[in-house]
Amino acid sequence: MTRCFRLLHGLLAATAVLLAAHVVVILFTGGYAVRGLGVRIGGHRVLAPVIVLIAVALARRFVRYRAGASVRFFAPPAAATVFLTCLLVYLANGQTIWSGDTLPARYLPLSILREGNFDLDEFPFLQDPRKFPNQWFIRYANGHVVSDYPVGAALLALPFYVPSALGTVAAETRLVEELEKLAAATIVALSAAVLYLTLRRLTTASAALLVTAAYALGTTSLSESSQALWQHGASQLGLAAALYCLVRGRQQPHWTAFAGLPLAFAIISRPSDLLIALPLGLYVLIHRPRQVAGFLLAGLPVGAFQLWYNATTFGNPFRVQFFFSMTTAIHDLPSGAGVWTTPVWDGLRGVLLSPARGLLVYSPFVLFSALGMLLVWRRGGDRLLRYAAPGVVAIVLLYSRWVNWWGGSSYGPRLLADLSPVLALFIYPVVPILARSRALRMAFIALVAWSVGAHAIGAFVDDRSWNWNGNMVVDRFPERLWSWSDNQLVNPPRDAFHRAVIAARRLPTSRNAPQLLSASYRSDSPASVVIDCGQTLQLSVGATNVGRAAWLAQSARERGLVRLGWRWYRDGRSLPLAEGRVLLGAAVLPGESHEFRASITPPREPGAYVLEVGLLDEWVMWFAERGTPPIRLAVTVGSAPVLPERADALPAMIHELRVAADHVPRLAVSTDRSRYRPGDVLRVALDGSAAGRSWTVDAYLMLWGPGGRRWFYDGRHIVRARECQWTPLARAVALPDGHRRRVVLDLPTAELPVGSYTWHLLLTEVDGYRIVAAAETSFELTSAKTAVNGWQGGSVEAELNHRDRDLPGQPRVARRADLGQR
């Protein structure tokens, strides 16, 4: 038997070496050809061989364990087994998830390794408005395109990109997506291994293994953090490592000082972790005073890096990205204004109990974490966890107050992912109770099983669990977050059940029998609609399957999927516009009905159109071709609101719109000088303030030039406007009562002809086109060769810091209120 094990071990070792060599070559080249065979190996795919390599490594470890080697499979030294097992599970779906939030972290390692900087200038596709109409994930600073998110995750991903950065791999290949996935999965798997080591110092091996499994597979660690380079993975690893150091520091005091490094890294990766770091730092100060200096010194390099990054990127060492700048708005914004306006009980109910985002719905085993949190406060309870508990509560309350508490388009309670290792550690005080009570033990195991299943749906069930966010964009229709019949947990199991029924009854389907498809529609929409250019049409359509074939919600290569679609017609001709789609959540059997909700954007050119809405069998036919008449609506698209040419026309317009004049936002547009030469950088300042009430508005900017020609700013250039008159400047802007906000833009003038120009700005109510304020300013573009005095370029961000002034006697207002995905 020993000889057989040795032979098997040798074969596995040889296989591992070959696979490792194969992976390294792919990472350097993006794929390679085998001479003589005429085939290409790899082809920008690296996940599959890595998955096999990990499986082989686990098999070798198991063979050594069975052969009686001195390696215990799930003993404390076997944290490597925990790491490899988690990594294998995270990669097993073989998929990459697209999210704009993670795009900077995907490409930053290439920029750091190839160019030695932190900008994204060399990736112009990230700035392409055709690919990314809303570029919330980047910003422009000091003349460069930079990430709008902390760079901690990108720094941890650097080792995975080294071969590709040194090799010939292009940025726009699938291999780079897979490198992001591999890095994210490895980071979270490491956090699971570190958590296991921490728990082994506190409880038994079996309890440590069960709690680690709950953390690794029953939280967003499986469904999100391990699938792409969000900030959460780096945050989880940093917090897990800090807790390990602090726990080990009880027996070996110098380990307490080491906690400063991972804790500081967690903060720069996810600045909200400061709410946990502060009480943990207080624990060190009070109970480990001799380690305070070492604790601070350990975190000093990370803090110094962040200050350097802020200074070189934004021109100010204390100018930070995204979330930390948003948290400063908590004390800046008065009640009822800005991004921290959700009533705390409403937000708390959402982050804990929402069918689409609730922590207790997707990871209900954390109820035992809450019990552990109570137990540590009794006499003799764990002193370290007493300090961690307020940080957990603070972060939950923080996100409960955010207006976007559901975290945009995501799966489950993504915003609370950072708390996962801390919540897992709070279970260990409950272990003695679980050991004594079989009922509680079974309840805990059942809740862990539910949690694993819930997050496995997000990780393994194709894209359908994610597509739920986009059918009716959840950011615009947050009421969908409270549906118990249509959510990311219910739809995939329902679809699986219906597919089982289809197989058992041998029903024809939309894929193999499209000739049997038929439907009846119902809609409460009027026969004719008038809508302004740029607005969206909300449509609810009920569809009943009156045919003999089942409608499929998933199918290989999408062929045979039944979806709701629409087409636009003008003068009897179909327009070359992208046909919209709304997806089914689950298969629909004959006799069943499904309610579709669609958000439809009309053509941008004003005029009369016909909108045709109906079901289609993807890649096969529209139902209308089989005799099911579609819903037809006559849609009149009007012009976007037109700004009055004269400023004195504004009060009359406001009066007609029934907006109280004394509550109208004050608005001004100004340029840094009145005359420019072609090629100069034009600086436009937009100043808004509110008095009497708070506003949340959309801003629209338009440049009128010589001969009445109109231009607009697309985020990078001033370009000629061909269709819609007004274009949005920002997704949403908050104007709190009594506050003033300034936005400064640097605009190139190279594309503009010589002549006189007028900038027009208007503010409208969010999700509507009712104008509430308007302003204008003029400038001259001259070809004169004489010098034109004035500002000639620089950093928008730095200028914001110096010029974001407030009304006299009023508190400072936050500079951003972007309500996009975070």
Locate predicted features.
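Transmembrane-helix motifs of polytopic, lipid-linked glycan transferases
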Residues: L179-T203, A241-Y244
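Transmembrane-helix signature of polytopic, membrane-embedded enzymes
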Residues: G167-R174, A192-G218, L237, R250-F258
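Membrane-interface alpha helices of multi-pass inner-membrane proteins
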Residues: P109, V211-A213, A242-C245, W255-R270, ...
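Hydrophobic, aromatic-rich transmembrane alpha-helices
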Residues: T2-R3, G281-L285, V361-R383, A389, ...
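Specific aromatic-rich, kink-prone transmembrane helix
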Residues: V194, A234-L263, V422-F426
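Perimembrane helix-loop-helix junctions
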Residues: L275-W308, A370-G381
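Start-transfer (signal-anchor) and selected internal transmembrane alpha helices
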Residues: M1-L18, A48-L91, R200, G294-L297, ...
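Signature aromatic-anchored transmembrane alpha helix within multi-pass, membrane-resident enzymes
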Residues: F73-F83, L296-A304, L384-V393, V431-F460
